[in-house]
Design a protein with these regions (language model features):
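Basic- and aromatic-enriched surface patches that contact anionic nucleotides/nucleic acids
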Residues: 1-133, 212, 219, 224-236, ...
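C-terminal subdomains that position terminal phosphate/3'-OH groups for nucleotidyl transfer/ligation
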Residues: 110, 114-252
Length: 252
């Protein structure tokens, strides 16, 4: 209205691109002056999922934010900082075969492990909302709790890497031929399954080549397990089934 800003990013009337208010046809000026400007007010006590949904709808720029980038802004606190630390201290990116992680995929996977390992039997889809709720509830943490979470992630990740070595979190067959690189559903199956074994104080049945053969055969011959890591992977039954199969398969 004060001719401060030019129109930009128009999909309708592209010929008006760059025009300021005083340069517009009078009929366009009248439309603008008579138009109601709708605002969404987000209060401090607004439900976290509502905040996430609003920001997700507004997220329409040239480079859209990932769910984790939104989560990092909405729920930032001890937990998010700890996830960043966990990625660095565990050298998680090497397991993912990622050189740089500007979109925070690794941090999301850390949160995914923490959320599923602690509330696996209470999991409800969608997965993004499940992680959001966990992030909100654990935003602020005492030092003892932070130490516990960090220790759990690094210990179980080390178990997985020591067990499957270069095939960690990859889909492969009984001949150890890789069919696809990092699979996030297989990741949480192994991490949560191993977490349960570790919590029971039981040793793993196998490591190295024997473990690889065991997992490759499972993927190749168990159709239900294969579906659980490839189709509708965030369904409650699929999430619970795949972790339990890993627990039973690798529990000594």
């Amino acid at each position: 209205m004060k001719n401060e800003f030019p129109l930009k990013g128009l999909t309708a009337y592209p010929e008006l691109e760059g025009s300021r208010f005083h340069e517009l046809d009078p009929r366009f000026q009248r439309h603008i002056q008579n138009r109601t400007l709708r605002c969404i007010v987000i209060l401090k006590d607004t439900h976290p999922q509502v905040k996430f949904d609003v920001f997700e709808r507004l997220n329409s720029g040239a480079t859209k934010l990932t769910p984790q980038e939104l989560r990092h802004g909405l729920y930032y606190g001890d937990l998010m900082a700890l996830a960043t630390r966990a990625v660095k201290e565990s050298n998680f990116l090497s397991a993912l075969e990622i050189k740089n992680d500007k979109r925070m995929k690794a941090e999301e996977l850390v949160l995914r492990f923490w959320a599923l390992s602690e509330s696996h039997d209470k999991y409800k889809k969608p997965l993004a909302t499940f992680i959001n709720d966990y992030s909100d509830k654990n935003r602020n943490l005492p030092q003892k709790r932070k130490d516990e979470l960090l220790k759990n992630f690094t210990r179980i990740l080390t178990m997985a890497k020591d067990t499957f070595e270069e095939l960690t979190f990859k889909v492969f067959n009984s001949e150890l031929k890789v069919e696809s690189t990092f699979n996030s559903a297989l990741y949480d199956a192994i991490m949560v399954g191993f977490y349960k074994i570790d919590k029971e104080g039981v040793e793993l049945k196998a490591t190295g080549d024997k473990a690889k053969k065991l997992l490759g055969t499972l993927i190749e011959t168990d159709d239900k397990f294969r579906r659980s890591i490839s189709i509708a992977t965030s369904d409650e039954a699929q999430v619970r089934y795949r972790a339990e199969v890993i627990r039973k398969t690798f529990r000594a």
